[in-house]
Amino acid sequence: GRRRLREGDGRHGLPVTAPAPRPTLEHLPIPLLAMPMGTGGVGLAWRQAHHALGVPAAVGEALLGFTALLWIALVALQALRAFRHPDAVLAELRHPVRVAFAAAPTIGLMIVAAFLHPHAPWLGAPLWGIAVTLHLLVAMLLLRRILAGRGEAAMLAPPLMIPFVGNVLAPVFGVGMGFVQASWMMFGVGIILWLAVQPLLLHRLFAGPPLPPGLQRLIAEATART
């Protein structure tokens, strides 16, 4: 954006601020990749409500179909962003908090696989396998970054659990597809990773540097409700 003074600003001593950056592909945030996790979770819950309570199945399937399209659109946009603006993507991956959202697309792909499996098992099952493999890779890379000391205190925030929750979530879908042994393996890996990361988060909460005021309020409200 332009940073030149407008005519008359200098004479009257008015503060001059640079205009906000225009919303472009370069500024598309990585945390948006978590959106399919929310819509897909509601869709899968509605599917179960159809079996248990008899609610209309079309609502859940429509939500899941929308989730699949949303996942494709967001991943495609981020891929295009990485091609056109690699420095912007690398900057987010170096961010201590936003890097955790790099695992969101693999969880979204698990949800898409669960949506497709009843309709096209030949497609849903392989997609689950691909999602699990990629998710394990992302989770291990993130854990390596933490244990190697490159994860500063700011990294130990609630979004850090996204990569590790996915390892426990994968069996929920995998067992129904027939991947019983692989699901047990993923569950075991998820528990081990949780045991490795949870103490770090608790130490950050009780003995680490003060949390940002906004995060303090969120944790206080969540604690008050329990």
Annotated model-derived regions:
Residues 17-45, 60, 64, 85-111, ...:
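Juxtamembrane helix-loop boundaries in multi-pass membrane proteins
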Residues 47-59, 76-89:
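Membrane-interface helix-loop junction between the first two transmembrane segments
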Residues 1-15:
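N-terminal amphipathic/basic-hydrophobic helices that include classical n-h-c signal peptides
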Residues 46-59, 114-125, 170-185:
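Helix-coil boundary and interhelical linker segments in multi-pass alpha-helical membrane proteins
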Residues 78-86, 114-124, 142-148:
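Transmembrane alpha-helix boundary signature
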Residues 138-142, 172, 196-205:
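Alpha-helical transmembrane segments in multipass membrane proteins, preferentially the mid-helix core
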Residues 62-73, 122-136, 183-194:
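Structural signature of hydrophobic alpha-helical transmembrane segments
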